[in-house]
Amino acid sequence: TISLEDYDGEIVVLNSWGQWCAPCRSEADDLQEVHSELQKRKIGTVLGINVRDYNPQVSNDFLEDNGLKYPSIYDPPFKTAAALGGVPTSVVPTTIVLDKQHRPATVFLRSITAKDVMDVVDKLEKE
């Protein structure tokens, strides 16, 4: 089980995705780039939330085929959204950048680039 408490004091980039989602596939490399940079700086992680893929093998294959090294939880009904409060379950991909206290700093209701996310991370790192 993965919990935000595992990343206490770190920036966490949450990304809801599905292997069936074309924008999710296009942003996968960018998210891996963000994760690598966060790990290199020792300031955080990307955490994927696999939604609406009801075959866990398909989602695992997506992670492996794309060389994604960041942790990803399997949550087809997207129950995580309820815990986050106010996150639309119908918009995939959604990327939420959480500050070091795990408060939402930015929400992207679209596909992202590494620059989109790192611009936010760079500001949060200075806080």
How does the language model describe each region?
Residues 64-69, 75-126:
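Thiol/disulfide oxidoreductase modules built on the thioredoxin-like
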Residues 25-66, 76-83:
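Structural microenvironment flanking redox-active thiols in thiol-disulfide oxidoreductases
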Residues 15-21:
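Aromatic-flanked redox-active Cys/Sec active sites in thiol-based oxidoreductases
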Residues 20, 48-49, 107, 118:
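Second-shell loop/turn segments in exported
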Residues 13-14, 46:
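Hydrophobic beta-strand anchors of alpha/beta hydrolase catalytic cores
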